[in-house]
Amino acid sequence: MADYLISGGTGYVPEDGLTAQQLFANADGLTYNDFLILPGFIDFIADEVDLTSALTRKITLKTPLISSPMDTVTEADMAIAMALMGGIGFIHHNCTPEFQANEVRKVKKFEQGFITDPVVLSPSHTVGDVLEAKIQHGFSGIPITATGTMGSKLVGIVTSRDIDFLAEKDHTTLLSEVMTPRVELVVAPAGVTLKEANEILQRSKKGKLPIVNDQDELVAIIARTDLKKNRDYPLASKDSHKQLLCGAAVGTREDDKYRLDLLTQAGADVIVLDSSQGNSVYQIAMVHYIKQKYPHLQVIGGNVVTAAQAKNLIDAGVDGLRVGMGCGSICITQEVMACGRPQGTAVYKVAEYARRFGVPVIADGGIQTVGHVVKALALGASTVMMGSLLAATTEAPGEYFFSDGVRLKKYRGMGSLDAMEKSSSSQKRYFSEGDKVKIAQGVSGSIQDKGSIQKFVPYLIAGIQHGCQDIGAQSLSVLRSMMYSGELKFEKRTMSAQIEGGVHGLHSYEKRLY
């Protein structure tokens, strides 16, 4: 046993692993599969890990997860679901400006405290108008005022219970004949606090609580469904008015300024400038324009993969940076353009530079597993943007179809010819709108049905928390501090090590993640 003895006592611990600086010191481009994080010391439970992180200089999320502005990933349904679970969704711009603004409006109206601009109708409107509003906005509890506008005298309310059993021939019936009249309504006075209004609504057992002033004029409304959402989604991302946070993508051309105006009017909280290569005169000019016209609007620039690219956008005034070029599962930019960078290296290099200016970084692309999310955050990213991970979920745009008995949804890169043919916005993203020959930088494909993100995102959240627990970081800010101080250690993986780290040696197996 003598050969096992080491003199000097138990205080001796040999140096082990590499710091992030050492890991990326040479010119090798590393991606998430090329390294592992060495475990630390656990003295807390996984549920205690705080995942709060910055999206931009002024917007903080309770969950570091973002859905990508792709036309097969994020429209209103996805953005609503992401915001409810503490993240945020960015509505794609491969559509008309009006359609995109309406999607943002759906998100902002989905869950609120005091709804100060609800849909309002007059007694002379018809049942058909209510049904049309339900199709457009997703609800049918509509206050009725004398003139059909806010600030007018409240005369009643129409809910689904008032019109559920009406036949199609009754769609021309006036609302004055079917509405619940004012005398039967429970209301709250203007000036009531949100807490007091919620208590009144709970006691009344009504679906809606109108807020009226001394002249009985409608000034706001509160919905019971919002109370239930507040209970079920404690991490929900909300603005100062208790509305869900929502982002939107725009291009960098002159006609995108009209789109920007509509998005700000719809209530977008943050804009991402959508470009495959963000270090351009077009994007810098757009940042200057937005900051001059809408100084309080948060702007995310990108995409970038080097500190030099990041510098120009930070100097222009961006509030966040989107990192990634050619690393997405449906992206062929590196193959076609010979430009890009392995995502691990890109995230570390840009985040290390941007943190000096207080600019958060979004790791965009190359995320295939929850382990990749943890690695991106450990390299300095504040949040992670996902495309393929969220594609083919219930909330993603598009219809399911079957192929060989498998339920699928379409998923395509915004640089694919399919996406470019749908709208010129995709062409502008890749600077090709004026080209006679379109150069595809993405592909179209399909992904197997994943079900609802109501189950998938909680799995991601729990996975991040357990990853941080193994590392010994009780919050994402601690995780980044450990990385920059050198306390967090990494190790490169050979191809054999990568094979060993996956499932191997089995004849067959079933891989259930949640």
UniProtKB/Swiss-Prot annotation:
Main location: cytoplasm
Binding-site residues, IMP: S329, D364, G365, G366, G387, S388, Y411, R412, G413, M414, G415, Q441
Active site (record annotation): C331 (thioimidate intermediate), R429 (proton acceptor)
Residue numbers binding K(+): G326, G328, C331, E500, G501, G502
InterPro entries assigned to the protein according to its UniProt record, in alphabetical order: Aldolase_TIM (IPR013785), CBS_dom (IPR000644), IMP_DH (IPR005990), IMP_DH/GMP_Rdtase_CS (IPR015875), IMP_DH_GMPRt (IPR001093)
Keyword terms, alphabetized: CBS domain, Cytoplasm, GMP biosynthesis, Metal-binding, Methylation, NAD, Nucleus, Oxidoreductase, Phosphoprotein, Potassium, Purine biosynthesis, Repeat
Coiled-coil stretches noted in the UniProt entry, renumbered to this chain: none
Modified sites of kind Omega-N-methylarginine: R341, R355
Gene Ontology cellular-component terms listed: cytoplasm; nucleus
HAMAP family the record matches: IMPDH
Functional summary from the UniProt entry: Catalyzes the conversion of inosine 5'-phosphate (IMP) to xanthosine 5'-phosphate (XMP), the first committed and rate-limiting step in the de novo synthesis of guanine nucleotides, and therefore plays an important role in the regulation of cell growth. Could also have a single-stranded nucleic acid-binding activity and could play a role in RNA and/or DNA metabolism. It may also have a role in the development of malignancy and the growth progression of some tumors.
Name of the protein: Inosine-5'-monophosphate dehydrogenase 1
Species of provenance: Mus musculus
